[in-house]
Amino acid sequence: ERGTVVIKRPGRMRWLYTAPERKEFVSDGVTIYAYFPADKQVMVSPAPTGADTTPALFLTGQANLVRDFTAAALDIPGAAAGLLGLKLVAKQPDPDFEWLAVGVDPVNYQIRHLVALDRQGGRSTFVFTDLKENQRPPDTLFAFRIPKGVDVITNAR
């Protein structure tokens, strides 16, 4: 899959997938909206809280590496050569994730590669390119308006 992600601390994210099909994930820090235009469906869930250790909290700076994770050096298969790899296991077991693997650029410490293994054995891999930091996106970018004519599924978590 291919797309863009914009992250703003604390807890705000917008993931826009453009290929192979469009889908959108938006968090305003309180609620997460997962929009699937082809299915005419929006899933609405509470955003993770400080008690969680999801990849989202890690990326938005809400998780604390030392407090929340046990870290170990790791070679990440498929990651670009030269990245520093860390395997992160939550100190408090997360109901959804086994571990995260992070590939960090040793020059500027940007996260370039992220792998999340869920409790069902599913693996999600993200490769970040063309990173731009300190862009100060407007808060309105993280507001989601539910389109007319879609089914809304609410998850209590």
Placement of each model-derived feature along the sequence:
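A conserved hydrophobic position in a structured secondary element of the catalytic/binding core
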Residues: 27, 61, 104
